[in-house]
Regions:
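Hydrophobic alpha-helical connector segments
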Residues: 64, 75-105, 155-162, 183-186, ...
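Short loop-to-helix capping motifs
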Residues: 57, 114-119
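Secondary-structure edge/capping motif, primarily at the C-terminal ends of alpha-helices
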Residues: 112-115, 173-176
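C-terminal peripheral helix-coil segments that are non-catalytic and often amphipathic
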Residues: 1-3, 85-96, 133-134, 138-142, ...
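Amphipathic alpha-helical packing segments from all-alpha helical-bundle domains
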Residues: 74, 100-103, 119-146, 157-160, ...
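Helix-turn-helix
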Residues: 18, 22-60, 64
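Short, basic, alpha-helical segments at the C-terminal edge of helix-turn-helix-like DNA-binding modules
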Residues: 67-72
Length: 202
């Protein structure tokens, strides 16, 4: 029985995934400053020039890596309508994902931390953080509209606070994993935001 030949797009997708995984591994092992297109290509088992062919520049690679490692951080939310329920599921799922701290999650948090002092990352993560806050603001606005969130909740303030809390917990998990009980924390933090935001129902 012959194995079906992969299409050109399938080969391209496989190569890009391998390159992004290699880039994430290098970030985790040696830091973002070690990242070059040539090293990523070699680490992935391809030629030194393949990463350049796919991404064009180191900056474009970092942009793609940031997007790829953030996507799917909390699975199961695609298609969920915005509102209090989605917000609480996001918080619970984010902290739960930190309990496993898989390679993409670890790489994303390390890149995010580096963005404070690395100019080539700062613009990328301003955009990623704003996209995250925008989703959170949508949840707050939808919850106020449907009567599940208090009308005096300020969407911008809540979005900033939730993002800061989740990323802060993530960095603590990176630095001192035993000190962060994610299973207990996911329940307490989700419960806190439910109490802080939910409009009491009659």
């Amino acid at each position: 029985m012959t194995t079906p030949r992969r299409t050109q797009q399938q080969r391209r997708d496989q190569a890009e995934t391998a390159l992004l995984n290699a880039a994430a591994e290098l970030v985790i092992e040696e830091g973002v400053h070690s990242l070059t297109l040539a090293r990523v290509g070699e680490r992935a088992g391809y030629s030194r020039g393949l990463a350049t062919h796919y991404f064009g520049s180191r900056q474009a690679l970092l942009q793609r890596l940031a997007h790829a490692t953030q996507s799917g951080f909390v699975p199961g939310l695609d298609g969920a309508p915005p509102g209090l329920s989605r917000l609480l599921r996001l918080i619970d799922g984010y902290i739960g994902a930190l309990g496993q701290l898989r390679m993409p999650n670890r790489a994303f948090l390390l890149l995010w931390a580096e963005a404070a002092t690395a100019a080539d990352l700062a613009a990328i993560f301003r955009e990623r953080d704003e996209a995250f806050r925008s989703d959170l603001r949508q949840d707050i606005a939808a919850g106020i509209t449907d009567g599940t969130i208090r009308p005096d909740a300020t969407a911008e303030d809540v979005a900033v606070a939730v993002l800061a809390q989740l990323r802060g917990i993530g960095l603590q998990r990176l630095v001192d994993s035993p000190a962060v009980d994610t299973e207990r924390l996911r329940r307490s933090v989700t419960g806190y935001w439910h109490r802080a935001l939910a409009l009491p129902q009659p």
